[in-house]
């Protein structure tokens, strides 16, 4: 059961991390992940690319400085240099330093998210959670993915009630049906594994009523199971 939870707990973070690593190669990202992410992928890609829009970074020199620091860290990450990308030292601010020094900028917020993903990959789930919590965006799908990743951190810390709370926030935050379906199913699976049958029934019933087009029948067995609890 623990292996299953660990695998499921990595799903959201891996989607979010893959999005980040490919943001400067958006065409390849879309081609690679269109089937996996479904109708949500276009909104997510556009949302992240929006962080690097002209209007956000050329007016304020601090924004420009933050962006340069972020892109340097991003380059290190794409080259497989995770420790350099994470940074945190004066000579190499990396994502952590950029998040700390430019927390009010869009690049600073995105750096907090990126640092959180690296900490997650290192198994530092509480640090990852705290960093992800600093990320904010006007894009509702990105906010949903943030809460989903925070939920994954809680799963790996065996704080399952907190994980369910984060998945619920992810469901509520998103204005994209596929993303809402994804986290509804994720919450249902977690509730089922915890034997919280009434809670699981709520989520799977929501899938049956709202998201059958995205589910493809994959949740039918779980829906039938919880109907009799």
Feature map (PLM): residue ranges:
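Short solvent-exposed coil/turn linkers within tandem alpha-helical repeat scaffolds
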Residues: 98-108, 122, 136-144, 171-180, ...
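N-terminal positive-inside, membrane-proximal cytosolic segments immediately preceding the first
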Residues: 2-43
